[in-house]
Design a protein with these regions (language model features):
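Mid-domain alpha/beta scaffold segments of enzyme catalytic cores
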Residues: 1-368
Length: 368
């Protein structure tokens, strides 16, 4: 889930290099990361907001908030208003107990900022790692965020990249006559070795009206073809469009590893996913009290097809719904999933990690 970004940038080596430099300023390379002496020790204490996420550590003498570093190019900020138009609680939730077995957050947006302080990607990765989220997939929704994903994956081995044009962005690009150019850019980026998925792509009939359906469907088909061409996984954004998503996947031929990001279907879609071998990735929405269909799908899902994600900074799990989200919060979602499936937490974590590596390949770090 992310909003469109209007600017399109020509894919040149100079621009890629500049974005890689940006990511290095946000996510240092592994050697720099391990050698750095971090202020406050970035302690993670159960029941307390992790130190990098605590605004009181970044107050100036006037009481104003101070960002850890300038946000700069490549980052955007989530609205401080909720869907109901009211101000949200911008305090990050407390840390849970670390997971018994490290897993993957297979869909997150580190470039989208939220909360009282700006969290560097390095600190987000460190906090997640301490709480059992050992690796992530950074997901693009347009050309700038896809370039950011590639640069972040180059800069830190805990990150792999997914690249795409979001379905809500596709109609605007089609109207501007630049959709094909954007797809050509993705085709070039897909050759990067740490790009492991095309996504998030798909169909969204909730935010885009009938006038945008044709462009969304054309874009979705082209993304499927890109994933197949490059042998990459496909991450699908599917909102109120289950029937057409399934139809187009079957018509085009779904990639071997097809993932329904932030799974939102019910029993019938779960049955189809089980039959086709498509993965179901569960976000914080599975914990919501009104998500009975998603919870039923979780119970139905074949174990080898289950993944977990945050879609951070969105979709924070219950009981912190509406507050800022980050990869460490996958921990809460997975605990709910284990309880709901009546499965041991350790077994579920091992299963999610194995499934994630099967879909995306190796991160090149121990255990992943």
């Amino acid at each position: 889930m992310c909003q469109s970004h209007p600017e399109q940038t020509e894919l040149t080596q100079e621009y890629l290099d500049s974005l890689a430099a940006l990511a290095h300023s946000t996510v240092p390379n592994e050697q720099e990361l391990r050698a750095s002496a971090l202020p406050h020790g970035w302690q993670v204490e159960e029941g307390q907001t992790p130190a990098p996420y605590r605004a009181e550590l970044y107050r100036d003498e006037t009481g104003g908030g101070i960002a850890q570093e300038p946000s700069g190019e490549g980052t955007r900020r989530r609205s401080t208003k909720g869907d109901n138009g009211r101000s949200r609680n911008l305090v990050f939730p407390p840390a849970p107990e670390p997971l018994p077995y490290a897993i993957v957050d297979n869909h997150t947006h580190m470039d989208l900022l939220d909360g009282e302080v700006e969290i560097t990607a390095r600190d987000a990765l460190d906090t997640g790692e301490k709480l059992g989220i050992g690796a992530i997939v950074q997901v693009g929704c347009d050309i700038p965020s896809s370039l950011y994903a590639v640069a972040a994956a180059r800069a830190d081995r805990r990150v792999l990249a997914a690249i795409a044009i979001h379905p809500n962005t596709a109609p605007d690009l089609e109207s501007a006559g630049t959709l094909d150019e954007a797809l050509e850019t993705l085709d070039a980026l897909a050759a990067e070795p740490r790009v492991r998925a095309i996504g998030e792509t798909g169909l969204d009939y909730f935010r885009t009206g009938e006038e945008g359906v044709e462009a969304q469907q054309r874009s979705f088909r082209e993304h499927i073809r890109l994933a197949r061409k490059h042998g990459l996984a496909l991450q699908i954004h599917d909102r109120q469009a289950h029937d057409d998503v399934v139809r187009i996947l079957l018509e085009e031929g779904a990639p071997e590893h097809t993932v329904f990001h932030c799974y939102s279907g019910g029993a019938e879609l779960a049955r189809i996913c089980n039959e086709q071998g498509w993965y179901m990735s569960f976000a914080g929405t599975v914990t919501f009290k009104n998500s009975k269909d998603i919870q039923e799908s979780l119970r139905m899902a074949r174990p080898e097809l289950i993944l977990a994600e945050t879609d951070a900074p969105f979709l924070t799990p219950h009981p912190f719904r509406g507050r800022p989200n980050a990869s460490y919060m996958t921990n809460y979602t997975v605990r709910f999933m284990a309880a709901h499936r009546e499965q041991s937490l350790e077994d579920l974590c091992q299963m999610i990690r194995a499934n994630s590596v099967r879909v995306y390949g190796s991160w090149g770090i121990e255990g992943f």
